[in-house]
Design a protein with these regions (language model features):
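Nudix hydrolase/Nudix homology domain
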Residues: 4, 37, 80-149
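A generic structural micro-feature
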Residues: 9-13, 40-43, 91-96
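A residue-level structural signature of the nucleotidyltransferase/glycosyltransferase Rossmann-like core
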Residues: 11-12, 28, 43, 110, ...
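Conserved Nudix-box catalytic region and its N-terminal flanking loop in Nudix hydrolases
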Residues: 27-68
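A short coil-to-beta-strand element that immediately follows conserved catalytic motifs
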Residues: 72-82
Length: 149
């Protein structure tokens, strides 16, 4: 489905998840969107995506992180942080986002990106994440910045 191809009614919402992965040294795993994406091409983000019917958000974020990065966070410290809501009546795309934060020790070689979705990745400092956000090329940062500490 292409972005902006939704047909939701004003009172309908879908659920998405985002997963912040932080190493004990304070660095974060961020991914770069494919350069051929219709929306946000080449921008930075954290792993995430839609929750499937019958799936709870924790299972969805574990699945999305594993699909996009190859990392299994099912036994990692951390978990649910908070949720936010977006209402976009013009786009007919209303959604809730559940934000998760996991603490896990991993190295570059542990990351196996999903080539259909992810252009690349970076083990970034908080300052690097904030710099991408200031440039306007880090998706959802303003809605989730409190989970980066």
């Amino acid at each position: 489905m292409k972005r902006n191809d939704w047909s939701m009614k004003p009172d309908e919402f879908h659920l998405t998840v985002l997963g912040v992965l932080k190493r004990p040294d304070g660095r974060y795993l961020i991914t770069q969107r494919k350069l051929d994406k219709e929306w946000g091409a080449g921008w930075w983000e954290v792993p995430g995506g839609g929750v499937n019917a019958g799936e709870d958000s924790r299972d969805a974020v574990i699945r999305e992180i594993r699909e996009e990065t190859g990392i299994d966070v099912s036994q990692a410290a951390g978990g649910y942080a908070f949720s936010y809501k977006r209402v976009n009546p013009e786009e007919k795309n209303n959604y809730f986002v559940d934000i998760y934060k996991f603490i896990l020790d991993f190295v570059d070689n542990d990351v196996k990106v999903q080539p259909e979705e992810v252009e690349g990745f970076k083990i970034a400092t908080l300052e690097e994440v904030q710099a991408f956000a200031k440039e306007g090329i880090f998706l959802h940062y303003d809605s989730m910045k409190e989970v980066f500490d």
